[in-house]
Structures are given as structure tokens and as C-alpha cells.
Amino acid sequence: MIRVLVVEDMPTARQLLVGILSADPELEVVGQASDGAEALALVRALRPDAITMDVMMMPVDGIQATAQIMAERPTPIVIVTSLDVNEVTLSMKALAAGALAALPKPRGPGSPGFADDARRLVTTVKAMSRVALLRRPEPARAAAPPPAAPPDVPRGRVVAVAASTGGPAALQRILARLPAALPAPLLVVQHIALGFAEGFARWLASAGPLPARVARDGLLLEPGVVHVAPDDRHLGVSADGTRATVTDAAPVGGFRPSGTPLFRSVAAAYGAGAVGVILSGMGRDGVEGLADLRRAGGRVVAQEAASCAVDGMPGAARAAGLADAVLAPDAIADRLALWLRR
């Protein structure tokens, strides 16, 4: 039985979440909290296996509560919030503080999408409760020293990133350390719930010196700009590498967006000028695409296991022998800046 703590300040929404979770035979709601301070006390007393957490609460909000829980007793946290763009942006801050996933609040019973929302909530809570490696957010640390003689860098360059569970925190660390004059566009596939892409892009834009936007089909790719895959769409680049492509092609390995189409696309367009980065996440999405990128002469950076919330995707890339470098997020940023410098 998976023991769940529900944290939500609105009684009606809290009752809805409790009802959905309690209806599943594998889940038991062991406690309910109406703010972050109460949540922390119940985590200490009940030691739940998973937590659903709202972000907009008083006096202690979900971001503060997540940070305190991850520092004191790391527990899988699923953020459940409204799709208001400001709340979505706050949800990203909670992910950076250590939460593993973010979902929109379920629609009420009788709504056409209620069954799908309930199923998604239950499935996500179960999956996150099984995450074996949970780490509190790391303090900043010195980057690994760069190689003495970096390889030559081609003129046309691009950085493609794939991430899932635990990825937002790592990506934030990377973007905060990159130079504003990055001489390449940066494309990001992040597995995230529907409705969260715009808030995710806004949050990334606040994480460092690089502007970030949700990509659209045909968008001109600009150096020093982060281009984020839209909700439920694959992201790639045009054959000449100048524009974004956004498609609703079938999911790859169950994911849309997926890292594999992105990596394959930049491999075909940029060849040796492509750099693939694979960050924390469950499963092995992106690994097949990284193999194509390596065959095209590109380079691959995989996040090290010790700094991952979940070492599935980068671990699979390392196991396949695809990583040219295995680094913590801060060091990934420094290595990218080195490889891409003019």
C-alpha cells in the first residue's frame, strides 16, 4: 500500500484529490494538510510514501514546503495546481526545489475529462512513489576542469536537451551558468504535463541570462535563445538547421515530445556541430536519437548519477557508451560554453 499525504488549502479541491486517490486499492491517504507548515509536521509524524502538493497556500506555500521536506526528509512530491500561467511558473520553482512532477488539478466529477485526469493523477503518484533515488537539491559546486585542448568546433552549432523527472532542476542550474552570448540555439524537450509548457518556458527565462520561448513550427532558431517543445508536440529542426519544426507525429516510446526525434533531427541538420545533453529522468527516452547524433559526429553530455533525481535516461546513455562527458549540471554548463566558444 502506498501511503499518500494530500496538501491543498481549498477544502473542495482537497476532498476531490482524497476521493480520487482513496478509490484506488493501492493507495491510502494517511493525512491531509491545508498549508506547508502543516504538511511538514505531518511528514515528520506520518512518513508518507508520496505527497501531492499545491503551490498557492498561506502562510507557508508549496515551494517553501517542498524545499523544507527535501532538506529534512526527502519524499516524492507531485505538484498539483491550476493551469493559471503564474501558478504553473510557481510549480516550476517547486520542481527546482525537489518535487518530481507537476500536474493540473483534476476537473470535477461529471466533467468530460474527469476520468482521464483521475487516472493521470493516480498513475503519476504511483510512479513517483517508486523513485528509488531521491536527493535534496545540491549546493553549487565548482565545475570539473575543462580539457586542456578542446576539439575543433564546426561553424554551425546547436545544443539539444532531453529531460524528464528531475530535469527542470538540473536544467535551471545549467541555464543559470551559461553565458548570455551563447553562440548556438538551445532546444529543449522536457516531459511535462499538458498545459505546463508556457509556464515552463517563462520560468526558464527567469533562471539565467538566456531568453526562453515555446517553439512553433517555422520559428527562426536564434543563437542564445532557449526553444522549448510545445505541449504534446515533437520538436526538431528544418533540414538546413535554421528553423524549428513542430509536429504531432506519433509518440516515440510513449512520449510526445520525445528526445529521440529531436536528437535525430539536429544530427541530420548539424552533424558534428550538434551537442546532445541528456538529463535526469525515468526510462530511456532519447538514447536512440543520441546514437544517431554520435554517428553524425556530434558530442553527447550525460548528467552524472549522483546529481540525478532519477538516473534512468542519462544512465541508459552512459550504459550504451554514448557519453563523451559525464558531469554534474554546473560542469555541463561550463563544458557547453567551452565546446561552443568561437
From Swiss-Prot:
The active site is at residues 164, 191, 285. The modification 4-aspartylphosphate is found at residue 54. Residues 3-120 form the Response regulatory domain. InterPro entries: CheB-like, CheB_C, CheY-like_superfamily, Sig_transdc_resp-reg_Me-estase, Sig_transdc_resp-reg_receiver. It catalyses: [protein]-L-glutamate 5-O-methyl ester + H2O = L-glutamyl-[protein] + methanol + H(+); L-glutaminyl-[protein] + H2O = L-glutamyl-[protein] + NH4(+). Belongs to the CheB family. This is Protein-glutamate methylesterase/protein-glutamine glutaminase 3. It comes from Anaeromyxobacter dehalogenans (strain 2CP-C). The lineage of its organism: Bacteria, Pseudomonadati, Myxococcota, Myxococcia, Myxococcales.
